[in-house]
Amino acid sequence: MSAEVALVYRVLPESVEVDVEKLKEAIVNRLAPKYKVDKVEVEEIGFGIKALRFYIRMPESDEYSSDEVEEILRSVEGVGGFELEYFSRLSF
């Protein structure tokens, strides 16, 4: 059985005017079906700014990479920035 990799990304919208629900939907749609989004949390930062935290799973394979996930995040309109908070190999 092959292992999987877990990633957690914190994504910031480019401005407070960005609808985080629409941004969340756009990111999930761009990642799917190749990457599995297990959960998305909305984090209140302050002054109306909200961050999104994406919990993503992918097979441990050369066909999948955190670089590709980051390219996808960069390509979504409304994303102001992001950071990889967690990266771990999962095996069962």
Curated annotation (Swiss-Prot):
| A Pfam match | EF1_GNE
Answer whether the UniProt record assigns the keyword Ligase to this protein: no
User: Which molecular function GO terms apply here?
Assistant: translation elongation factor activity
* Entries under InterPro entries matching the protein: eEF-1beta-like_sf, EF1B_bsu/dsu_GNE, Transl_elong_EF1B/ribsomal_bS6, Transl_elong_EF1B_B_arc
Any coiled-coil ranges, and where? Answer: none
Q: Which UniProt keywords apply?
A: Elongation factor, Protein biosynthesis
Asked whether the UniProt record includes DNA-binding among its keywords, one would answer no
Chain's role: Promotes the exchange of GDP for GTP in EF-1-alpha/GDP, thus allowing the regeneration of EF-1-alpha/GTP that could then be used to form the ternary complex EF-1-alpha/GTP/AAtRNA.
Which HAMAP family does this chain map to? EF1_beta
Q: Which family does it belong to?
A: Belongs to the EF-1-beta/EF-1-delta family.
Q: What is the name listed in the Swiss-Prot or TrEMBL entry for this protein?
A: Elongation factor 1-beta
